């Protein structure tokens, strides 16, 4: 089901059109792994911790524009129309970490963050 849904994104959605164009121009990047070190105090409520926590992840995709980077992540959560804010809230911290990692890896600013909800067939700006 997910691959069919992704095909729908790629064919019909504005995001898909932009991804196709970026791919043609060599500006589309998919499944980008990263490992970043963060002070524990930045990730947890334990103030004063001097330890470094390694955060490992895989960014579903991003593409480069003249203005910077558009970050995107696919979500399979079961949602009802109107639940967009729930999705944004649920993944806010994850997307902040992805944004930070991309900016450090590329030296470019992330100018837009997008979540694609398969259950809503909708692209949501985060």
Regions found by a protein language model. Give the residues of each.
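Substrate-binding beta-hairpin/strand module that engages nucleic acids
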Residues: 70, 74-76, 107-126
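Non-catalytic protein-protein interaction segments used by genome-maintenance enzymes to assemble
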Residues: 38-96, 100
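Generic C-terminus detector
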Residues: 100-101, 113
């Amino acid at each position: 089901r997910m691959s069919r849904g992704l095909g729908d994104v790629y064919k019909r959605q504005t995001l898909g059109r932009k991804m196709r164009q970026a791919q043609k121009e060599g500006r589309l990047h998919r499944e980008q792994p990263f490992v970043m070190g963060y002070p524990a105090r930045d990730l947890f409520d334990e103030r004063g911790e001097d330890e470094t926590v390694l955060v490992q992840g895989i960014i579903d995709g991003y593409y480069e524009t003249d203005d910077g980077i558009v970050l995107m992540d696919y979500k399979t959560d079961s949602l009802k129309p109107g639940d967009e804010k729930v999705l944004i809230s649920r993944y806010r911290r994850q997307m902040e970490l992805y944004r930070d990692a991309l900016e450090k890896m590329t030296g470019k600013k992330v100018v837009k963050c997008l979540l694609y909800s398969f259950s809503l067939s909708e692209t949501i700006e985060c």
